[in-house]
Amino acid sequence: MTNIRKTHPLLKIVNHSLIDLPAPSNISAWWNFGSLLGLCLVIQIFTGLFLAMHYTSDTMTAFSSATHICRDVNHGWLIRYLHANGASMFFICLYMHVGRGIYYGSYTYSETWNIGILLLFTVMATAFMGYVLPWGQMSLWGATVITNLLSAIPYIGTSLVEWIWGGFSVDKATLTRFFAFHFILPFIIAALAMVHLLFLHETGSNNPSGIPSDSDKIPFHPYYTIKDTLGFLMLTMLLLLLALFTPDLLGDPDNYSPANPLNTPPHIKPEWYFLFAYAILRSIPNKLGGVLALVMSILVLAVIPLLHTSKQRSMMFRPLSQALFWILVADLMTLTWIGGQPVEHPFITIGQVASILYFALILILMPLAGLIENKILKW
């Protein structure tokens, strides 16, 4: 008798994606981050659902409802901190996942890569709107500053901002709609993730060598289900360590003060995972230019497949490209640090140099390195 998982219409799909899926035999721990992102999304949806049961999206009661969750709801403090730090874990996994894609040339699967960029934008939008919900000082002022950037769009800018706000400032209407969007977007992310996987399974996974692995495939289960489970345990442990021992390590103390439109915080800054983009935005002294640079800092990922000049797919055997890749990582860390600093000397200059280097590395230096490596290998 044929196994039910191979014949049942629904189980057949699960079987082809998670059990009998042919996978390369040599994929390293860098290939774990996709499943870890799936776990993060599930954690965020469940903790978010329980938070939404007790949260009220009204400017008068939002802050106190968040406090009420921490003080009066059974394990409410844990649910809230798992959700807040779960977002940080989500972005750590996201950046590692994208970094892996760049290093090993996974971006040559252009459909998968482009859906991935769309997912990145959607997750960033969701996280931004979630940060507004507790209605602390940084929630209000972060929302005001970031939404105000749209006013740089010529002609329609001001009208667009007021349309998003639902008034003439970030107020009750804004908070209510942000809550609605923050609730629906994770489900859109889940749907996009399925499309992401659909495109990936059309081609099969890449592997560290960048060489086609059709001649050497192994079943996903049990080999990679066990490997993913180890990743799940490590991620869960790290998240629990964060949530139970240092829940406010990655947050901003200003967000424990209720939102006050009459009092501006000394340093308005987003959560740590947006600081690199925020630093790029601030490094350009023109509003529209800054907004374009901000969008391009993520959208630049879309041109990476077009600028692949090397005859090899992966960077595994390309020392010159490897060096540039790790300089890019260091540059992003520098930008993250600068984004959290006040706008004064020497931080302004460091931010500008790091921003120029970021775009130069991706658009000029890395494609150039590919050509040089081809030349050295006489290809």
From Swiss-Prot:
It is a multi-pass membrane protein. One of its GO terms (cellular component) is respiratory chain complex III. Disulfide bonds: none annotated. Its cofactor is heme b. The keyword Nucleotide-binding does not apply. The chain crosses the membrane at residues 33-53, 77-98, 113-133, 178-198, 226-246, 288-308, 320-340, 347-367. It is found in: Mitochondrion inner membrane. Binds 2 heme b groups non-covalently. PROSITE patterns: CYTB_CTER, CYTB_NTER. Heme b b562 binds at residues 83, 182. Its main location: mitochondrion. Keywords: Electron transport, Heme, Iron, Membrane, Metal-binding, Mitochondrion, Mitochondrion inner membrane, Respiratory chain, Transmembrane, Transmembrane helix, Transport, Ubiquinone. GO terms for molecular function: metal ion binding; ubiquinol-cytochrome-c reductase activity. GO terms for biological process: mitochondrial electron transport, ubiquinol to cytochrome c. CDD domains: cytochrome_b_C (cd00290), Cytochrome_b_N (cd00284). A ubiquinone binds at residue 201. Heme b b566 binds at residues 97, 196. Gene3D superfamilies: Cytochrome Bc1 Complex, Chain C. Belongs to the cytochrome b family. Heme 1 (or BL or b562) is low-potential and absorbs at about 562 nm, and heme 2 (or BH or b566) is high-potential and absorbs at about 566 nm. The cytochrome bc1 complex contains 11 subunits: 3 respiratory subunits (MT-CYB, CYC1 and UQCRFS1), 2 core proteins (UQCRC1 and UQCRC2) and 6 low-molecular weight proteins (UQCRH/QCR6, UQCRB/QCR7, UQCRQ/QCR8, UQCR10/QCR9, UQCR11/QCR10 and a cleavage product of UQCRFS1). This cytochrome bc1 complex then forms a dimer. Component of the ubiquinol-cytochrome c reductase complex (complex III or cytochrome b-c1 complex) that is part of the mitochondrial respiratory chain. The b-c1 complex mediates electron transfer from ubiquinol to cytochrome c. Contributes to the generation of a proton gradient across the mitochondrial membrane that is then used for ATP synthesis. This is Cytochrome b. It comes from Pronolagus randensis. The lineage of its organism: Eukaryota, Metazoa, Chordata, Craniata, Vertebrata.
